Structures are given as C-alpha cells and as structure tokens.
C-alpha cells in the first residue's frame, strides 16, 4: 500500500530540499504556479546546472531509494507544492 504525503516548500535562491525518497524510492509530483522559474536537481543545483521548471505547471518525478530533490529559485522565494507517493 502506498503512503501519500503533501507539503508546501518555499524554494529560495540557494538549493532548498523539496523532498527525500524513502528507502525504496517514491513518486513525486511538484506543482508551481508563481511567476518565477525554478531549477530542480541535487544538492548542488544552481540556475546554470539545474533542470528548468518554468512558471506554471506540474512535473512528475520518480526518485530512487534515498534520493533527495532540491530546487533553487531565480529570484526571491517560490512556493512549490509537493505530493509524495511512496511504498509502505
């Protein structure tokens, strides 16, 4: 049975942890609806090496076991809405 959790995380101009996968991995939905872009990646994510997640939308990511997903904002803080679906 899958465990489901949700959170609102404010991504800042330095790498901000959005979610950490469980020991057997998880599926993560990240929704963003504000004006500035963010970049997704590992702990070393920046606006030059991250995966661009533009203004409006939702991205669906499968995280491997114990992986961590970070985000960094182009400007200020950007709210990111997280839905984590993991295995029990």
What are these regions (language model features)?
Residues 54-66:
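Beta-sandwich interaction modules
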Residues 31-49:
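Short, surface-exposed beta-strand/strand-loop-strand elements in extracellular ectodomains
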Residues 26-28, 63-77:
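Noncatalytic modules at the cell exterior or secretory-pathway interfaces
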Residues 22-33:
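Forkhead-associated
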Residues 38-40, 76-85:
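Edge beta-strands of jelly-roll/beta-sandwich modules across compartments, strongly enriched
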Residues 1-24:
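Surface-exposed ligand/attachment interfaces on beta-rich extracellular proteins
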Residues 1, 87-88:
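Short intrinsically disordered terminal tails
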Residues 14, 25-27, 56-58:
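Intrinsic-disorder/low-complexity, polar/charged segments enriched in Ser/Thr/Lys/Arg/Asp/Glu/Gln
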